[in-house]
């Protein structure tokens, strides 16, 4: 028998963290796993600020806890992303926000690397996350949709106005 004794309080704390992160993974609209090793303190502070402003939660968590949480959340295939230092960005509302902020930041900070992610419960590769990052934000997409919906109404209104003006000038 070894002299090493496992601290039960530590095990309970880790189990609680696994539960917390499994729940976050289950509830999140999107998750992005990144390696932020090598970022300066200033860069890290800037990144966290941008993520917070976008409504994204950003945490650096031990890989063993993230692996267990991913298993518990039923996210098969995400565990491979948890090697080396891992930071995780969670968004419960905007699917695009974590990918967009991290990808935009990675353009200027070569030490930030996107590893993988989860979009609406589906494990996604680095390439898929970067493709999603190129999409407009939720607000941008809603704005585009509104423009598309308004165009036919605007055209009908202009046609009615033109007919009314034509009839006025004929009278």
From Swiss-Prot:
Example of a GO cellular component annotation carried by this entry: large ribosomal subunit
PROSITE patterns hit by this protein: RIBOSOMAL_L10
Keywords: Ribonucleoprotein, Ribosomal protein, RNA-binding, rRNA-binding
Coiled-coil annotated residue ranges, if any: none
Superkingdom: Bacteria
Database matches in CDD domains: Ribosomal_L10
Biological processes annotated in GO: translation
One Pfam family from the record: Ribosomal_L10
GO molecular function term, any single one: large ribosomal subunit rRNA binding
Job of this protein: Forms part of the ribosomal stalk, playing a central role in the interaction of the ribosome with GTP-bound translation factors.
Family, as annotated: Belongs to the universal ribosomal protein uL10 family.
Subunit structure: Part of the ribosomal stalk of the 50S ribosomal subunit. The N-terminus interacts with L11 and the large rRNA to form the base of the stalk. The C-terminus forms an elongated spine to which L12 dimers bind in a sequential fashion forming a multimeric L10(L12)X complex.
HAMAP family: Ribosomal_uL10
Protein name: Large ribosomal subunit protein uL10
């Amino acid at each position: 028998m070894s002299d090493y004794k496992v601290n039960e309080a530590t095990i309970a704390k880790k189990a609680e963290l696994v539960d917390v992160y499994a729940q976050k993974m289950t509830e999140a609209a999107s998750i992005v796993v990144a390696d932020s090793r090598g970022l300066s303190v200033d860069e890290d502070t800037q990144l966290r600020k941008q993520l917070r402003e976008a409504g994204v939660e950003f945490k650096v968590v031990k890989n063993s806890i993230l692996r267990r949480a991913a298993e518990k959340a039923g996210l098969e295939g995400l565990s491979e992303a948890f090697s080396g230092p891992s930071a995780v960005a969670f968004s419960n509302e905007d699917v695009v926000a974590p990918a967009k902020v991290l990808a935009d930041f990675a353009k200027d900070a070569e030490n930030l690397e996107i590893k993988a992610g989860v979009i609406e419960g589906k494990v996604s590769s680095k390439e898929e996350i970067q493709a999603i990052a190129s999409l407009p934000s939720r607000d941008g997409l809603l704005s585009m949709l509104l423009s598309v919906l308004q165009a036919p109404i605007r055209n009908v209104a202009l046609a009615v106005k033109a007919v009314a003006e034509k009839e006025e000038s004929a009278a």
